[in-house]
């Protein structure tokens, strides 16, 4: 999704790097705080509600452009861009905060369900599932970025705006090839948040129903 955010919206790699850094810091602190809270609450509901709220925060991220327009009444310009970046940054931090509700209740439930003689093996399988899930999301998002979105490559204004966002000059053949590739799937980055969010929300419902 990051190349799409950069091409469509002009969000710099620096801003994206700040988002990721804040997300990581907040996530680490959240796991500590949520570990204390999860010991005092219903673990199943705690995990399900946390996952559902995390999915909603991710879903909201895809509406960054719309929220910025609702607030500023503008479709472009520095005020529009800054408001959008602020909203997305807040959503990303909230996402990190809510992600921290996953590990503590899982660890608590697993130690209750699994006998000590099997705990290390089952915990290893559980930990591996995180990496497998992350890998599948990367594949899914790669597919989304290459197939979804709106083709605006025939719109000279849209192409010029993307070229400016990416810092590509009209005479740069290699750079313009990158711009045209992005223009063929404008807005696809939104689906990189919406589709995984829908899957996560369905998982949260499944936790309540089947766990």
Where are these regions (language model features)?
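Residue-level signature of mid-helix packing/kink "hotspots" within the transmembrane helices
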Residues: 24-32, 134-135
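Helix-to-loop junctions at the C-terminal end of transmembrane segments
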Residues: 30-42
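C-terminal ends and interior cores of transmembrane alpha-helices
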Residues: 52-80
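Cytoplasmic helix-loop-helix junction between adjacent transmembrane helices
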Residues: 91-128
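Glycine-rich segments within core transmembrane alpha-helices of 12-TM secondary carriers
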Residues: 121-149
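Symmetry-related core transmembrane helices of the 12-TM Major Facilitator Superfamily/SLC fold
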Residues: 190-209
């Amino acid at each position: 999704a990051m190349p799409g955010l950069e091409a469509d919206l002009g969000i710099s790699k620096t801003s994206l790097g700040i988002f990721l850094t804040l997300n990581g810091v907040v996530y680490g602190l959240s796991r500590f705080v949520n570990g204390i809270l999860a010991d005092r609450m219903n673990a199943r509901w705690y995990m399900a509600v946390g996952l559902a709220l995390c999915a909603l925060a991710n879903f909201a991220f895809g509406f960054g452009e719309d929220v910025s327009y609702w607030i500023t009444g503008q479709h472009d310009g520095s005020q529009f861009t800054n408001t959008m970046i602020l909203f997305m940054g807040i959503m990303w931090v909230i996402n990190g905060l809510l992600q921290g509700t996953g590990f503590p209740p899982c660890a608590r439930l697993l130690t209750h369900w699994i006998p000590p003689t099997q705990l290390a093996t089952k915990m290893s399988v559980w930990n591996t599932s995180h990496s497998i899930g992350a890998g599948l999301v990367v594949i899914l998002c790669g597919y989304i970025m290459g197939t979804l979105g709106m083709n605006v490559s025939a719109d000279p204004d849209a192409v010029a705006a993307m070229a400016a966002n990416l810092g590509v000059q009209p005479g740069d053949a290699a750079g313009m090839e990158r711009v045209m590739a992005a223009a063929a799937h404008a807005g696809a980055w939104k689906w990189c948040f919406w589709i995984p969010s829908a899957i996560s929300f369905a998982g949260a419902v499944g936790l309540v129903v089947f766990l």
